[in-house]
Amino acid sequence: MSDLYAVIGNPVAHSKSPLIHAGFARQSGQDVRYEAILAPLDGFVETVAAFRQRGGKGANVTVPFKLEAHTLSSCLTERAKAAGAVNTLVFGADDILGDNTDGAGLVRDVAVNLGYALDDRRVLLMGAGGAARGVIRPLLEHEPAALVIANRTPQKADDLQRLFASSGNVLSAAYEDLRGQEFDLVINATSASLQGDLPPLPKGIFAGASLAYDMMYGKGLTSFLQFAQQQGAARLADGIGMLVEQAAESFFLWRGIRPETEPVIGMLRSSLGSP
C-alpha cells in the first residue's frame, strides 16, 4: 500500500505539488501517493487530523495555513522557528514536526541550479511578509555583504531587520531610500507579480552582473522580470526552481532520499509553457 502525503491549502486546485512529487516518486522508485486537499478556511486543524487518521505520513502546507501549521506543530526545526511559519509537516506516532523548506529551496536554486554565489553580494529582498521572512536566515548563512529588506510599509521591514540583526548585516529601507544604490541580487518576495503589478522600485538598482529573481512564476516573464530586463539585469529567474527545490527538501525529510530536481524543473516548465 502506498504511503500517503498531501498538500493542504485554500485554494489548492492550482498546486503543482502533486505533479512534482509524482515525478520525484517515479525517479526514486518510492511507493507514495500525493494528493491535494482543500481545507475550509476555519478547518485546517480538523483537516490535518482527518488526513492523519487516513494514514497520512506528512503534508505540505500552503496559503493561508502556514502560520496555523506553525502553531499546530509539537516541535519545530530551527529554520521553521526563524521563518515563523511551517510549510512541511512530518507526522510521528505522537507528535508533529514542523519545518520550513522555502529558504532552502530558494538558496539551492540560486546557488546550485543558477550557479550564482551569494557570498559578498549585495542582496535586495522586496517584501516583508511570510515569503520574505522564510528566506532571510538561509540567505544570511551564505554571508552576503549586505541584505537590504525593502517594503511599502517600512515599519514591517524594520521589524524583520531587528529580528535578524544578530544573524548578519541586515538593513531595512523604504523603496524611495533605494535611489542611487545598486544590488547584485534582487529578489521579489511580494505577490505583486500575480496581479501584474510591481513594487515601486527606482531605476538603476541592478549592478553589472546582477540576477533578478521573482518567487512568482507564470507562462512568460513576470512584471518584475520584465522591469529587470528593461533595467539591464544580467540574468533573470522565476520561482519554478525554488518551488521544485523546496519540494525536494520536503521529500528528503519524508523519505530520506534527495531527488534529482533538474528533470522535474524541466517537466514543470514544459507543462506551464514557461521559458
UniProtKB/Swiss-Prot annotation:
Subunit structure: Homodimer.
The name this protein goes by in its record: Shikimate dehydrogenase (NADP(+))
Pathway: Metabolic intermediate biosynthesis; chorismate biosynthesis; chorismate from D-erythrose 4-phosphate and phosphoenolpyruvate: step 4/7
Enzyme Commission no: 1.1.1.25
Pfam family, one: SDH_C
GO molecular function terms listed in the Swiss-Prot or TrEMBL record: NADP binding; shikimate 3-dehydrogenase (NADP+) activity
Function: Involved in the biosynthesis of the chorismate, which leads to the biosynthesis of aromatic amino acids. Catalyzes the reversible NADPH linked reduction of 3-dehydroshikimate (DHSA) to yield shikimate (SA).
